[in-house]
Amino acid sequence: MLTAQDKQKIIKENQLAESDTGSPEVQVALLTARINDLKGHFEAHKKDNHSRRGLLRLVSQRRKLLDYLHDKDVERYRSLIKKLNIRR
């Protein structure tokens, strides 16, 4: 589970402006952190299919945001993919 300090750190690293908390970059970074956090959960609990459904929903939501960013600005998309080490 991400703590409030972890979220603030992720937001600070990815925000475009001082008060930016809702840009696609910030949202994708937060979703990526949650997805990576759940990966560790599934190593210990392989049969937790209820949480797996939630993971798939998070991955889908991140994919939609990445597709939106790709349509709007390809350079921002590529830099974000490289920064977060997301494969495409």
Swiss-Prot record:
GO terms for molecular function: rRNA binding; structural constituent of ribosome. InterPro entries: Ribosomal_uS15, Ribosomal_uS15_bac-type, uS15_NS1_RNA-bd_sf. SMART domains: Ribosomal_S15 (SM01387). GO terms for cellular component: cytosolic small ribosomal subunit. It holds the Pfam family Ribosomal_S15. GO terms for biological process: translation. Keywords: Ribonucleoprotein, Ribosomal protein, RNA-binding, rRNA-binding. Disulfide bonds: none annotated. One of the primary rRNA binding proteins, it binds directly to 16S rRNA where it helps nucleate assembly of the platform of the 30S subunit by binding and bridging several RNA helices of the 16S rRNA. Forms an intersubunit bridge (bridge B4) with the 23S rRNA of the 50S subunit in the ribosome. Part of the 30S ribosomal subunit. Forms a bridge to the 50S subunit in the 70S ribosome, contacting the 23S rRNA. Belongs to the universal ribosomal protein uS15 family. This is Small ribosomal subunit protein uS15. It comes from Francisella tularensis subsp. holarctica (strain LVS). The lineage of its organism: Bacteria, Pseudomonadati, Pseudomonadota, Gammaproteobacteria, Thiotrichales. The gene is rpsO.
